[in-house]
């Protein structure tokens, strides 16, 4: 295959982004954005949030104030590494301490006098414990000197039970674009949120709604619950911007379709009529009257001037330091979009579009919780001071209130999966797939309550805005999370920015904008508004917009602003806006730059020769105009060519229409999809199913499983895949392995391997083929007195325990064995008993079907004895275990065949696995055949011409034709054996061999597809799911077997099982299982008159309904199931009467059977 040609330049540039970039501080690209997000929080943002100085209470017109000051914030890393934390069974936390001072300020003639009320210097080792994110090589952001373990990528937290936790990224509820909604015909709303910049703490949120009803245009109002007045949007814009209504009319009508202009005129005319209806109308007086009315309505304690100042100053918090005039122009630009959206809704980004949303990363979770809990902490201090002053007359604070900030509980809840009372953010790391370390932190999902609303079911669809930024294959295909969790593509990441960087960047951009001629950036009537994070800063001359955007993008790429991830979006289509985004939580990815119809990659001749020695940051620095980091909003409003090949086939005029060009198709997949092979050669559903199965594959975990008491399934003899993609290699998924190479044959075997059944060779299993070891944690808590009690009668369950009451190391546990002594004793109140002490065993037993060896035992002594046992078990493939290829050809072991039963080739080689050949045709997985062909070709030429081992690159999605791969295989075979004939060469290339029948030693009539492939073992193991039970516990309500193997549960016998038995005519079995089984039998008496169930009063059965009517009905005894009685009782409790009626049948008479003569025939 050709290498480093011009046609592959885009592919090579894409690969540069995936590999580590130490010059830019990128050591592991897939999770780098998570590391930066958390590092920003714990190194910078936490100090900003906790460092506080503000008034708690004020008296006597602010001449006396109770102040709180939090300072000396210090964060200390743990003394040990994550491995030591796991061995000790402890969490891996950083300690945060601070000093709290509460004092009283009194304003006097001499100045301000300060009186100390309370002080607390937080040195408590449990004040605030912040879970530390473990990064690449076991690093943490507080102590970068920790040793590196190259295969440990981290991305996990360790909680107090030493359980590893990983989280997904949630889509933020607040949208950056206003949400348009049709309330009813001709009635619309436009809702938007305003959030203060990151440098303003505490963060202020305001939510506004603009309403418009065509039948009542005078009521086109803007409102906000308890934070703003309800006022006509046009008059508010006029009040803030200090312009005339005609100015607003011209601004709204500029570059609008005729139908929108008509609506604009109607709205302005309605506002005029509103002003004319008021005598001597004055806009200031009108607004002041509304503010006074709101002041009275809210019964505010503030003066009217303070109330008005607070309301107008806090209006639009995201434009906190912006003059009112710019706020007015911003409202006019919002109204433009609103009116246009009424007629052209499809052209406006809808609420499900990722353009409108930011993403919450790990650091943002902790930042939000720290901010909320700090406000609760300060509120508790304020309430405590007020209560003490009210009850005792002193300003004092209880020390308990000062020492309980509440952050520990919030962080603990976060790692339990609850972020702000919403489930789904964090989960326990599954210890069977190393790949989950990458896939879970790179997945993006929605709040659960965001999807409970029926109107938001459309959020489950693959939205057009997700194209290129999200993997279209790796989405859940079943269950409640269908379509809700998406994987980022390999080139996508999420932006992070420090507060200081944010302010510097905002300042530089504003200086650049103001460097233009003043009149050109003051086109507020007919210009294009320029916003930075939705805050209006200027309005540009329409004739300059293209030059401005082009120049801005060039300066951005050259590092003029000091940030390469700034997003600039030119919104045309009559909405007319230039949006500059610099905040955190934006989705970004690189694109190839097209400038004036030229692909900039092609106009840099030095790039190709120097590319091998450069990192991605070097390319951005030395060839800045080749690649641009583009956020999802800029991408949506830009013209992007799908591939370099298509771009080069266009004419010059067509090329000039494009701004960007995409990388090859393999970079649109996520890291899980990249572990598959050639999904574009298969049917569509195979990609989705393949991603789900790849995440279930058992891999080789890098953590020290013998020193960690934790659950896990681990591949014992893993092999690195031969056929890989670049993403699989750079993410270290390939190096950490998730399968083995096996020899397969596609054929039928005695009719055993039908459907998903596979045949596996016995000797292959005995040699350790796809062998795994299961590590399992067993944890019990025992009362101290029970643990110290001695058993009176020797129990078989305690045969594996030592004299100290704990299970022996290296003991083999079987089902029913106890893991620690737990004997409960009780004293009988019987004076005649010789020994009134009785004891009985209440220990938890080992419940697995297979024997396990005890590897480690840990004991903690508190008020209870906590025993943790780690067991290990080697588990070879057995019947029913599941396996799969990387093309979603899942199979279940149907038969384990001896080598002598299997067909063999001319060299005596037998296949390790036999797969049903019809599965290729039914599932259309052509790439599975290609993988076998490429793996076989590698086996004859595993080294390149330089003598280096080279895996075969077969990306998950690629534009390479199958003929190219066949040609590559042909070259490999011709190089190793140039004397092959055409037929022999064809058989080698297409892996076709003549196999011999093991019973007759004669060749089969047709050739068989026979070759090596990378095979995966899935976590679905027979012995983990199989359950055997004859009798046991039942549920109280329905009296069926309880659920769960661990609880000794069984199979619930329901309607489907009943129907199966009915189909077989097993009437007696049905009666026995459903009615006559133990306590399920129920005798009831039925009143033949009214059909009620008779009640039992003083051991006498009577019908309550008939007895009140002085009737004497006949009671008939019937036997029924307990479930039927429960059903009737519940229906009666809900006011529904179910009448039990008896079927009246005439008696049936059968004729006598014919007599049978049993005499022998010769006696007759």
Curated annotation (Swiss-Prot):
- Annotated TM spans: none
Report the GO molecular function annotations.
Answer: DNA binding; DNA-directed RNA polymerase activity; metal ion binding; ribonucleoside binding
Q: EC number(s) of the enzyme?
A: 2.7.7.6
Catalyses which reaction(s) = RNA(n) + a ribonucleoside 5'-triphosphate = RNA(n+1) + diphosphate
> Keywords, A to Z?
DNA-directed RNA polymerase, Metal-binding, Nucleotidyltransferase, Transcription, Transferase, Virion
Its annotated compartments are: Virion
Give a Pfam family name.
RNA_pol_Rpb2_3
Question: Would you tell me the Gene Ontology cellular component terms?
Answer: DNA-directed RNA polymerase complex; virion component
Q: Which GO terms describe its biological process?
A: DNA-templated transcription
Assembly and oligomerization: The DNA-dependent RNA polymerase used for intermediate and late genes expression consists of eight subunits (147) kDa, (133) kDa, (35) kDa, (30) kDa, (22) kDa, (19) kDa, (18) kDa and (7) kDa totalling more than 500 kDa in mass. The same holoenzyme, with the addition of the transcription-specificity factor RAP94, is used for early gene expression.
Can you tell me which family this protein belongs to?
Belongs to the RNA polymerase beta chain family.
Function, please? Part of the DNA-dependent RNA polymerase which catalyzes the transcription of viral DNA into RNA using the four ribonucleoside triphosphates as substrates. Responsible for the transcription of early, intermediate and late genes. DNA-dependent RNA polymerase associates with the early transcription factor (ETF), itself composed of D6 and A7, thereby allowing the early genes transcription. Late transcription, and probably also intermediate transcription, require newly synthesized RNA polymerase.
Q: What is this protein called?
A: DNA-directed RNA polymerase 132 kDa polypeptide
């Amino acid at each position: 295959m050709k290498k480093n040609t011009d046609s592959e330049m885009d592919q090579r540039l894409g690969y540069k982004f995936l590999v580590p970039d130490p010059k830019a501080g990128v050591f592991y690209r897939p999770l780098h954005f998570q590391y930066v997000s958390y590092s920003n929080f714990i190194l910078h943002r936490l100090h900003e949030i906790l460092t506080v100085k503000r008034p708690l209470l004020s008296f006597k017109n602010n001449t006396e104030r109770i102040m709180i000051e939090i300072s000396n914030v210090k964060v200390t890393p743990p003394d040990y590494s994550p491995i030591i934390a796991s061995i000790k069974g402890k969490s891996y936390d950083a300690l945060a301490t601070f000093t709290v001072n509460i004092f009283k300020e009194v304003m006097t003639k001499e100045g301000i006098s300060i009186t100390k009320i309370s002080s607390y210097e937080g040195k408590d080792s449990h004040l605030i414990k912040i879970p530390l994110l473990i990064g690449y090589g076991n690093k943490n952001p507080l102590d970068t000197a920790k040793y590196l373990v190259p295969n440990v990528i981290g991305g996990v937290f360790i909680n107090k039970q030493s359980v590893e936790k990983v989280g997904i990224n949630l889509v933020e509820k607040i949208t950056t674009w206003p949400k348009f909604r049709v309330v009813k015909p001709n009635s619309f709303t436009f809702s938007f949120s305003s959030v203060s910049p990151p440098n303003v703490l505490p963060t202020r949120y305001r939510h506004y709604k603009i309403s418009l009803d065509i039948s009542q245009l005078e009521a086109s109002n803007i409102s906000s619950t308890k934070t703003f007045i309800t006022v006509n949007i046009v008059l508010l814009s006029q009040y803030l911007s200090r312009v005339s209504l005609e100015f607003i009319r011209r601004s709204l009508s500029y570059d609008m379709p005729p139908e929108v202009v008509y609506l604009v005129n109607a709205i302005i005319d309605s506002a005029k009529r509103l002003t004319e209806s008021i005598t001597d109308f004055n806009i200031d007086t009108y607004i002041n009257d509304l503010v006074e009315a709101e002041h009275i309505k809210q019964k505010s304690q503030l003066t009217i001037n303070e109330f008005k100042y607070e309301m107008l100053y806090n209006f639009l918090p995201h434009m906190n330091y912006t003059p009112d005039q710019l706020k007015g122009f911003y409202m006019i630009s919002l109204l433009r979009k609103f009116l246009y959206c009424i007629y052209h809704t499809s052209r406006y980004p809808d609420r499900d579009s990722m353009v409108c949303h930011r993403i919450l990363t790990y650091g943002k979770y902790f930042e939000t919780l720290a901010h909320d809990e700090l406000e609760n902490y300060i509120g508790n201090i304020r309430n405590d001071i007020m209560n003490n002053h009210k009850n005792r007359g002193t300003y004092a604070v209880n020390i308990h209130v000062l020492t309980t900030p509440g952050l520990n509980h919030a962080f603990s809840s976060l790692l339990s999966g609850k972020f702000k009372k919403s489930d789904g953010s964090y989960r326990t790391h599954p210890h069977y797939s190393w790949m989950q370390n990458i896939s879970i932190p790179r997945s993006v999902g929605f709040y659960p309550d965001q999807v409970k609303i029926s109107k938001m079911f459309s959020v489950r669809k693959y939205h057009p805005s997700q194209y290129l930024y999200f993997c279209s294959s790796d989405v859940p295909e079943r269950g409640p999370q269908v379509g809700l969790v998406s994987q980022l593509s390999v080139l996508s990441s999420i932006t992070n920015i420090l507060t200081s960087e944010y302010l510097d960047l905002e300042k530089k951009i504003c200086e650049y904008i103001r460097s233009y001629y003043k009149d050109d950036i003051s086109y507020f009537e007919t210009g294009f508004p320029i916003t930075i994070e939705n805050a209006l800063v200027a309005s540009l001359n329409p004739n300059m917009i293209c030059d401005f955007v082009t120049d801005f993008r060039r300066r951005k790429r050259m590092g003029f602003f000091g940030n390469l991830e700034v997003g600039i979006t030119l919104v045309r289509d009559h909405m007319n806006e230039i949006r500059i985004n610099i905040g955190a939580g934006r989705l970004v990815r690189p694109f190839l730059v097209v400038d004036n119809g030229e692909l900039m990659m092609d106009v840099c001749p030095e790039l190709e020769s120097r590319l091998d020695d450069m990192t991605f940051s070097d390319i951005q620095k030395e060839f800045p105009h080749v690649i641009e980091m583009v956020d999802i909003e800029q991408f949506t409003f830009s013209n992007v060519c799908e591939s370099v090949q298509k771009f080069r086939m266009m004419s010059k005029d067509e090329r000039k229409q494009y701004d960007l060009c995409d990388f090859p198709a393999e970079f649109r997949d996520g890291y899980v999809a990249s572990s598959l092979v050639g999904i574009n050669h298969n049917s569509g559903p195979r990609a989705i199913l393949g991603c789900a199965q790849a995440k279930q594959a058992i891999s080789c975990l890098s953590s020290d499983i013998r020193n960690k008491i934790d659950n896990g399934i681990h591949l014992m003899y893993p092999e690195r895949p031969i056929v890989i993609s670049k993403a699989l290699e750079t993410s270290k998924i390939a190096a950490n392995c998730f399968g083995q190479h096996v020899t397969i044959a596609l054929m039928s075997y005695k009719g055993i391997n039908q459907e998903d059944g596979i045949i596996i060779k016995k000797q292959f299993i005995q040699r350790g083929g796809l062998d795994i070891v299961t590590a399992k944690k067993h944890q019990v808590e025992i009362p101290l007195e029970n643990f110290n009690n001695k058993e009176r009668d020797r129990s078989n369950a305690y045969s594996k325990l030592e004299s100290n009451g704990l299970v022996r190391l290296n003991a083999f546990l079987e089902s029913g064995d106890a893991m620690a002594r737990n004997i409960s004793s009780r004293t009988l109140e019987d004076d005649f008993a010789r020994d009134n002490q009785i004891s009985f065993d209440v220990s938890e037993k080992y419940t697995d079907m297979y024997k396990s060896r005890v590897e480690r035992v840990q004991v903690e002594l508190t008020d209870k004895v906590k025993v943790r046992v780690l067991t290990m078990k080697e588990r070879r493939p057995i019947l029913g275990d599941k396996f799969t290829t990387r093309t979603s050809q899942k199979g279940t072991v149907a038969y384990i065949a001896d080598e002598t039963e299997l067909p063999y080739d001319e060299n005596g080689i037998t296949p390790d696995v036999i797969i049903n050949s019809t599965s290729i045709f039914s599932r259309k997985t052509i790439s599975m055949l290609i993988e076998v062909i490429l793996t076989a070709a590698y086996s004859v030429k595993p080294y390149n011409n330089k003598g280096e081992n080279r895996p075969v690159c077969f990306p998950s999605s690629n534009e390479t034709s199958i003929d190219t791969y066949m040609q590559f295989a042909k070259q490999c075979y011709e190089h190793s054996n140039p004397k092959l004939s055409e037929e022999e060469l064809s058989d080698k290339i297409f892996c076709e061999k003549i196999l011999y029948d093991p019973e007759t030693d004669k060749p089969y009539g047709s050739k068989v597809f026979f070759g090596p492939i990378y095979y995966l073992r899935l976590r679905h193991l027979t012995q983990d799911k199989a359950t055997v039970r004859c009798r046991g516990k039942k549920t109280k309500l329905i009296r069926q077997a309880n659920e769960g193997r661990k609880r000794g549960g069984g199979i619930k016998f329901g309607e489907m099982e009943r129907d199966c038995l009915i189909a077989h005519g097993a009437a007696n079995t049905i009666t026995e299982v459903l009615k006559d089984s133990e306590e399920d039998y129920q005798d009831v008496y039925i009143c033949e008159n009214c059909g009620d169930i008779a009640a039992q009063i003083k051991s006498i059965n009577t019908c309550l309904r008939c007895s009140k009517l002085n009737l004497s009905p006949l009671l008939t005894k019937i036997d029924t199931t307990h479930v039927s009685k429960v059903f009737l009782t519940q229906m009666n409790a809900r006011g529904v009467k179910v009448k039990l009626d008896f079927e009246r049948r005439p008696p049936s008479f059968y004729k006598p059977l014919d007599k049978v003569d049993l005499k022998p025939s010769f006696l007759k």
